[in-house]
Each structure stands twice: as structure tokens, then as C-alpha cells.
């Protein structure tokens, strides 16, 4: 941009110099024309003097001596006049040559002036094109800066969501471990209850065999059986609840893994878009 401005200033300076040279050439031309006019006037005056001398020579040709002297004087004047005429002709020729050179300089100056004006016009058009491109580039950079800020915000949101999902996953994994421990504990208790049920069943069979002997204890045994049955149902209910909890947690883990995968894909896409925007800004 500074180089173009310097070039514009140089072209303007060349234009001003060309105008000055053109004005100087015009002044030289006018001065040469004035000198040529003066020399032509002097030539006409000398021609008039020569004619007067010739007339005077004719007038006094009748007087031999005077005529001879006057003739010699007239011839001398004529010779001087011819010399003056020749000198004037040479001066006129020099003035004409100087006038031709001045006209050539004027034509050269005018041509340079025209070329300088064309170059200045082209430079102005180039400046306008460059300014338009610079304005478009600035607008594009502003848009890319806005897009970059938005991409950074999106990336930051994605990072926060990713961290939140990771924390949730850690919590769920911990809950899953505890649920698995409770399920194992429930399974152990179920096994114990099954063993206890078998023992109770065996005892019940033994009691049934001795029912007649121990009929007075029947109510007590029935109550024990009911209590044991309730404990068995409770254990089975707890085992079913543990199984449903494990199933629900497994589904939650699957959903979170899907969400985590989707967030990773989104984060990857945002990172690629951000890299692309940074590459565009770097290339600019």
C-alpha cells in the first residue's frame, strides 16, 4: 500500500514536471517566434536599406567621381547588407531549428504528460481494486474471527459436557459396582434361604411324621413356617429388585456410553472445523 502511494506521488510529481516542461517549452516557442519576428523585421529593414542604396546608386551614377565613390560606398553597404542578410538568415535558421527542438520537447513533454496521466489513472484504479480487496479481506477476517469464537465456545461446551458425562460415568460405574456387590450379597442370602428352606422342609417332613406325637406344638411350627416363608418371599423380592436395578443400571450405562460417543464425534467435528478455520486464517 505504501509502495503504491509512493508510486502515485512519483507519477503526480512526473505529471507536474511534465506540465512545467510543457509550459517552459511553450514559453521557449513563444520567445523563438518573437525572435524570428524581430529578425524578419530586421531583414525587411535591411532589404529596404539595400533598395534605397540601389536607388541612390542609380541617382548618382551620372557623376563619375561622386558616382564612383558612391558606387563603392553603395557596394560596401550592399556587401554589408548582404552579410547582414546572410547573418540574419543563419540566425533565422538557428531560431527555426531551436523552434523545432522546442516543439519536439513540447511534444515529448505532452506525451510524457499523457503517459503519466494514464499511469496515474491505472494506479488509481489499482488502488481502488486493492482497497476493495482489502475491505473484503477484513470483512472475511471479521466473519472468521466470529466463527472462531463460536467454535471455541462450542468446543468449551463440548469439553464441559464431556467432563460431566465422564463424571456421571464414574458415578454410575461406582453405583454399578455397589449394585453388583448387593446382588452378590442377595444371591448369597438367597442361597442361605434356600438351604434354610430345605432344612425347614426336612424339619417339616419330620414334624409331619411326628404330627400325632407333637400335635400340641403344631401351632408353633406353623408360625415358624409362616415366618420362614415370609423371609423367603422377602429374599426373593429383594433378589428381583436387585436384578431390576442391575438391568436398569446396565441400560443407563449403555445410554451414557452412546451419549459419550456422540459427544466425542461432535467434539471431533468441532475440532476439525476449528482447525480448518485456523488454517484459513493462517493462509490469509
From Swiss-Prot:
Domain remarks: The molecule is in a coiled coil structure that is formed by 2 polypeptide chains. The sequence exhibits a prominent seven-residues periodicity.
Chief site of localization: cytoplasm
Positions of modified residues (N-acetylmethionine): 1
UniProt-recorded name of the protein: Tropomyosin alpha-1 chain
Function: Binds to actin filaments in muscle and non-muscle cells. Plays a central role, in association with the troponin complex, in the calcium dependent regulation of vertebrate striated muscle contraction. Smooth muscle contraction is regulated by interaction with caldesmon. In non-muscle cells is implicated in stabilizing cytoskeleton actin filaments.
Positions of post-translational Phosphoserine modification: 45, 174, 186, 206, 252, 271, 283
Family: Belongs to the tropomyosin family.
Bias-annotated ranges (Basic and acidic residues): 53-80
UniProt cross-references to InterPro entries, sorted A to Z: Tropomyosin
Cystine pairs: none
PTM note: Phosphorylated at Ser-283 by DAPK1 in response to oxidative stress and this phosphorylation enhances stress fiber formation in endothelial cells.
UniProt GO MF annotations: actin filament binding; identical protein binding; protein heterodimerization activity; protein homodimerization activity
Source organism superkingdom: Eukaryota
Compartment(s) of residence: Cytoplasm, Cytoskeleton
PANTHER family (UniProt xref): TROPOMYOSIN
Cited PROSITE patterns: TROPOMYOSIN (PS00326)
Residue stretches in coiled coil: 1-284
Phosphotyrosine found at: 261
Keywords: Acetylation, Actin-binding, Coiled coil, Cytoplasm, Cytoskeleton, Muscle protein, Phosphoprotein
Amino acid at each position: 500500500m505504501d509502495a503504491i502511494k509512493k508510486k502515485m506521488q512519483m507519477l503526480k510529481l512526473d505529471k507536474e514536471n511534465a506540465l512545467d516542461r510543457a509550459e517552459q517549452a511553450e514559453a521557449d516557442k513563444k520567445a523563438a517566434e518573437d525572435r524570428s519576428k524581430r529578425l524578419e523585421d530586421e531583414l525587411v529593414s535591411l532589404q529596404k536599406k539595400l533598395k534605397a542604396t540601389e536607388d541612390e546608386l542609380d541617382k548618382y551614377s551620372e557623376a563619375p567621381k561622386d558616382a564612383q565613390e558612391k558606387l563603392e560606398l553603395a557596394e560596401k553597404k550592399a556587401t554589408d547588407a548582404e552579410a547582414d542578410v546572410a547573418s540574419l538568415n543563419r540566425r533565422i535558421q538557428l531560431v527555426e531549428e531551436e523552434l523545432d527542438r522546442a516543439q519536439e520537447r513540447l511534444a515529448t513533454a505532452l506525451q510524457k504528460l499523457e503517459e503519466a496521466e494514464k499511469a496515474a489513472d491505472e494506479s488509481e484504479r489499482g488502488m481502488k481494486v486493492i482497497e476493495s480487496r482489502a475491505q473484503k479481506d477484513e470483512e472475511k477476517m471479521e466473519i472468521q474471527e466470529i466463527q472462531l469464537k463460536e467454535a471455541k465456545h462450542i468446543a468449551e461446551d463440548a469439553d464441559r459436557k464431556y467432563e460431566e458425562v465422564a463424571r456421571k460415568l464414574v458415578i454410575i460405574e461406582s453405583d454399578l459396582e455397589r449394585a453388583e456387590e448387593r446382588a452378590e450379597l442377595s444371591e448369597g442370602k438367597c442361597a442361605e434361604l434356600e438351604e434354610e428352606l430345605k432344612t425347614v422342609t426336612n424339619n417339616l417332613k419330620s414334624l409331619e411324621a411326628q404330627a400325632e406325637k407333637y400335635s400340641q406344638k403344631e401351632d408353633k411350627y406353623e408360625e415358624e413356617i409362616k415366618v420362614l416363608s415370609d423371609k423367603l418371599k422377602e429374599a426373593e423380592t429383594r433378589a428381583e429388585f436387585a436384578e431390576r436395578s442391575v438391568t436398569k443400571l446396565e441400560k443407563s450405562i449403555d445410554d451414557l456410553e452412546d451419549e459419550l460417543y456422540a459427544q466425542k464425534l461432535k467434539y471431533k467435528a468441532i475440532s476439525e472445523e476449528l482447525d480448518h478455520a485456523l488454517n484459513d486464517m493462517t493462509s490469509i
